[in-house]
Amino acid sequence: MDPNLKGITGQSFLDDQAECSESDNSEQGCEESLSDLSDLIDNAECEQGNSAELFAQQEAFAFQEHIRTTKRKLKLSFRNPLQCITSQSNRSPGRAAPKRRVLDDSGYNEDILAEVAQVDENGGSEGYGSLASQSLSGQSQKNGKNRVNNGNKENIDCTRLLAASSHRAVQLAIFKEKFGISLNSLTRIFKNDKTCCSNWVGVVFGAREELLAASQTILQRVCDSIMLLTHTCKLGFMGLYLLEFKNAKSRDTVRHLFQQILQVENNDMLLEPPKIKSLPAATFWWKLRHSSAAFLFGNLPDWIARQTSITHQIQEDQPFDLSAMVQWAYDHNFVDEAQIAYYYARLASEDSNAAAFLRCNNQVKHVKECAQMTRYYKTAEMREMSMSKWIKKCLNEIEGTGDWKQIINFIKYQNINFLSFLACFRDLLHSVPKRNCLVIVGPPNTGKSMFVMSLMRTLKGRVLSFVNSKSHFWLQPLNAAKIAILDDATRPTWSYIDTYLRNGLDGTPVSLDMKHRAPMQICFPPLIITTNVDVAKDPTFVYLHSRLMSFEFANAFPLDENGKPALILNELSWKSFFERLWNQLDLTEPEDEDDGDPPSPFRCSARAAARDL
């Protein structure tokens, strides 16, 4: 036993050993902590690694999530162009293909995805990462081919339709390339092939050159003006026609005409009417007419000359002249407002004043004033003429010849002495007092109305109707008539005449009430009345017996086997009757009534006086 250990107790030994172990552990812990701190900073060189690819994948994934969210909001069909960038890019489970797909509208979805899915095949995409784009190039091309094949199967009918309609687009493009202007700028569209027009523009493709040359001569038979210019194009020979036909024709007629002459199909022709009120279109055709390569026949169409000629432009600038319109209506015997408006509007292409009339905003006012002025002139002219002059004027307006014996045979057929009738008719025309009214009485169907109405049309008389007797103005037509007819007078009519019109039947002046005017002093013109009431034998109207010349038509009007009149009573018959019995009726020749001066035509416009020949 060690002497140094003598006197050491057990408790002190344990304490000493415990202190030694604690000191050893603390030193060892310090050494370990120093070794850990020394490895905190690594000064060795670091390699780059694949951080760029990781960043590109993260950006692509974020962009794909943004696209998916946008499509969900817009309710677009889901199409993922980046299928396998990462396993996280296709989180949505696959859906079963629908049994029937609805065609997309005009490529709206494809435009959005096409901008996102475009990848540069040579250098890759810097935004999405070149490595990922290159890895998907093979699969995207394969999927693209499948989509193209499916699209061709679904849209095969649409492709054929577009191919058929594109033929016209190709023709229009060729025309614009050759002439530098669109065909639609020169023509207006007729939707109906049956609509007729005198002017047509035709563009023919693929016709043979010799047929185009032959059409220059063949079309002259049906056209007043021809303009033809030929060119060569990828479809063959192209011919541009501007035609003005003698008669208006429809598109079907013109197409059939070109098919016979040029031997071309329907889809090889473009046929439309020209824009006749377009100054650029008129200028184009005017310049084309002065081209050395153009074939010309006839004069320049009026609608081109009207817009390109200075003379025509000056005429169009002239204001409307009412006196010229009144002169036209007077020369053509138009007094009806509807006829004046219609026929004068038709002259707009020929008369500059008629064209100015159509440009006016108050056409109704001009028409009413023109009709009123024409009636004034005609009435004054009629009053100035004697009965002989008036009959001669009316007969000159009737063309043709008739048989005067038809009237004589009809009078004899009614058992009337012709000489007695002729004497009364002569007094009637000269308005002899107390012999100013001729009455034809008889049963129905004896030809009374036919006899007097044919005379009324010959002498341009007026008709009175007792149905208007409640009006104060029902006798107003007598103011502007050389002869008047009152057909089928009944007993109330004779009672009215016996009460109010005795002086009128005498031929003396009476006061006639006029609408919107003061009463006028006039003498009744010769009056012819037809009736079924025998006034001459009725004592009730005893005061009318001396004022009436009465003849009875007792026999029914003769008819032939076919039910047509056996005797012809018309204007030609009366014309021949007056010419034959002119002297017997004491009618004088117009030359005998003049003072020797040559008659001059009536002129109511301010136009220049015609030079004497």
From Swiss-Prot:
Keywords: ATP-binding, DNA replication, DNA-binding, Early protein, Helicase, Host nucleus, Hydrolase, Isomerase, Nucleotide-binding, Phosphoprotein. Can form hexamers. Interacts with E2 protein; this interaction increases E1 DNA binding specificity. Interacts with host DNA polymerase subunit POLA2. Interacts with host single stranded DNA-binding protein RPA1. Interacts with host TOP1; this interaction stimulates the enzymatic activity of TOP1. ATP binds at G442, P443, P444, N445, T446, G447, K448, S449. This is Replication protein E1. Belongs to the papillomaviridae E1 protein family. Residues 413-566 form the SF3 helicase domain. It comes from Bovine papillomavirus type 3. One of its GO terms (biological process) is DNA replication. ATP-dependent DNA 3'-5' helicase required for initiation of viral DNA replication. It forms a complex with the viral E2 protein. The E1-E2 complex binds to the replication origin which contains binding sites for both proteins. During the initial step, a dimer of E1 interacts with a dimer of protein E2 leading to a complex that binds the viral origin of replication with high specificity. Then, a second dimer of E1 displaces the E2 dimer in an ATP-dependent manner to form the E1 tetramer. GO terms for cellular component: host cell nucleus.
